């Protein structure tokens, strides 16, 4: 099993409901370790840059609006198979389809306000981590 790092974000719908600690605990209880964390309020420009891969999708404007509507907590998580483990703990994008006990099943309000984001592959993890953190901010 490989120790790897992944990117995780607690979205505005969750931070506004003071769920940062509860969500982080779920991640840590699954064996993931937070090696970098900061609370940020994304500008529209930052949200557009971070979600540029979705630029041509019909929901892009709404996504940017939502992500810049309040604070987010961006994190780097580390652990064995961290990418897959984080995605398992998050649950399906649509909370109606998420497994019991997952972050989205427990905390998400809707498919749009689904509380968390996590990298889906090593390449995206590296890109997303670099978008928000310098190397000196990650301390394992």
Swiss-Prot record:
Keyword Flavoprotein found: no
Record key words, sorted: ATP-binding, Cytoplasm, Kinase, Magnesium, Metal-binding, Nucleotide metabolism, Nucleotide-binding, Phosphoprotein, Transferase
Location(s), subcellular: Cytoplasm
Cofactor(s) essential for the protein: Mg(2+)
Catalysed reactions listed for this entry: a 2'-deoxyribonucleoside 5'-diphosphate + ATP = a 2'-deoxyribonucleoside 5'-triphosphate + ADP; a ribonucleoside 5'-diphosphate + ATP = a ribonucleoside 5'-triphosphate + ADP
A GO cellular component entry from the record: cytoplasm
GO terms of molecular function: ATP binding; metal ion binding; nucleoside diphosphate kinase activity
Binding site for ATP: 11, 59, 87, 93, 104, 114
InterPro entries per the UniProt record, alphabetical: NDK-like_dom, NDK-like_dom_sf, Nucleoside_diP_kinase, Nucleoside_diP_kinase_AS
Record bears the keyword Membrane: no
Biological function: Major role in the synthesis of nucleoside triphosphates other than ATP. The ATP gamma phosphate is transferred to the NDP beta phosphate via a ping-pong mechanism, using a phosphorylated active-site intermediate.
Similarity comment: Belongs to the NDK family.
Name this protein carries in UniProt: Nucleoside diphosphate kinase
Primary gene name: ndk
């Amino acid at each position: 099993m490989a120790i790897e790092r992944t990117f995780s974000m607690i979205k505005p719908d969750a931070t506004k409901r003071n769920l940062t600690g509860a969500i982080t605990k779920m991640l840590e209880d699954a064996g993931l370790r937070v090696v970098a964390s900061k609370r940020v309020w994304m500008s529209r420009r930052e949200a557009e840059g971070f979600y540029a891969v979705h630029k041509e999708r019909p929901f892009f404007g709404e996504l940017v609006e939502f992500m810049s509507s309040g604070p987010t907590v961006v994190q780097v998580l580390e652990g064995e198979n961290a990418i897959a483990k984080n995605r398992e703990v998050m649950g399906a994008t649509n909370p109606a389809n998420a497994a019991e006990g997952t972050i989205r099943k427990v905390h998400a309000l809707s498919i749009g306000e689904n509380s968390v984001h996590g990298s889906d592959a090593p390449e995206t993890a590296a890109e997303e981590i670099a978008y928000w953190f310098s190397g000196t901010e990650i301390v394992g």
